[in-house]
Structures are given as C-alpha cells and as structure tokens.
Amino acid sequence: MGIDYSTLKNRQRLERVNYPDNLGLRVHRALSWLNRAEQEADPDSRFIFLWIAFNAAYATDIDDREGLSEQRTFNAFLEKLQALDTTHRLNNLVWDAYPNAIRVLLDNPYVFSCFWDYQKGQKTEDQWKHSFDAAKKAANTALAKQDTPRLLAIVLSRIYTLRNQLVHGGATWNSSVNRDQIRDCVNIMGELVTAVIEIMMDSPNTLWG
C-alpha cells in the first residue's frame, strides 16, 4: 500500500483546523476505521473494517432496494472523486494495480446479488442469468471506454454483495470457498480507501454532502 493510515493521519492533524465540519467528521471516522483495518491480520475482519472506512467517507445511506451501482448519489460521489483526482490514483488502481482481480470479480456470480436472490427463491434462474449477462455487458462497456467511475461503481456493488454475505451470516468465517474474493477485495479496498480519503483531503472546499 503506497499510502497508509499513519501518513494520512499525520497530514490530517496538520490540516484539520481548516476542514469544514462535514469533511472533518468524515475523514476522522474513515481514518479511525482504516487504522483498525491495518492492525487486523484476519482477512474477513480486515475486509469489514475497510468497508466501514469507505462508508464513513461516503457517509450516505445505501438503499438495498436498488443496486448500489445504480444509485444516483453513489455514482455522483465516485464521479466527484474522479474529477478531483488530479494525480490519477483511481485510474491507477483500476487500470494498473488490479485489472486482473477486477475482471475475475466481475465474472464471479457468487458476488452478484441476483444470484443470491435466485438461491432464496426471489428470482428465477432465467432472471438472475439475464441480470448477470446485462451486468457483465455494462462492465465490459465501462472497461472498453475506460470509464473509471462507472467501473468502480460496478466493482463496489460486487464488493458490497460480499460484505452482505459476511455481515448477515451468509458465509462461514475463514471459508476456503471465498478466500480468493476476500483477498482481492481486501487489496482493492485497502488502496481505494486511502485514495478516497486523500482526494477528499486534497479538496476541503468541495461540498461532500
């Protein structure tokens, strides 16, 4: 990880007096969970702490009635981050650091929410497969256009599905079944959370919500 909690915390201590209250609280909370994540050796727990850190920065309720990647507020947040990312941290994350892990994640039905709706009898097999094909097509379009915010929204919707499996008891702790997904998601989220916090700190006068 290029930038860690200590680096960001030291900077925050120097700058926080100049942060608007809303930004200051988001950064403070996100850093506290990033710190906890970096201390955690267990991958499942580290993953959960990293998601909390990201959610602390986002600081907006996620409506489970609609797919995360389709939520207007969430997409606007990612687009704002991309527009303010003058050193291309998000682009580097998606296109240089983890392109293979991201492609594997996008092709994995077990981190696609409609698959689990099918398992619970809420969707038919044809419905979930149609949704999965449509989602892969959307992801491929984002890949072809190198549309970083759109691709991140789709990737994070998959990561959110994995988060839900763990938090709601739908997966076994330390399960061999999801080790690859957990490992990749921990790596991606570790880089993403630090990038998001840094971009927000770079733009204290931006309205963050």
What function would you assign to each model-found segment?
Residues 2-22, 50-142:
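Helix-loop junctions and short alpha-helical segments
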Residues 21-30, 43-44, 158-162:
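Helix-boundary capping/turn motifs
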Residues 44-48, 176:
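Short, solvent-exposed positions on alpha-helices
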Residues 24-41, 138-142:
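Short amphipathic alpha-helical segments and their helix-coil junctions
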Residues 32-36, 48-59, 158:
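Short, hydrophobic/amphipathic alpha-helical patches that form generic packing surfaces
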Residues 40, 65-68, 173-179:
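Short, surface-exposed loop/turn segments at secondary-structure junctions
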Residues 3-13, 17, 21, 118-209:
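Polyanionic, low-complexity intrinsically disordered segments
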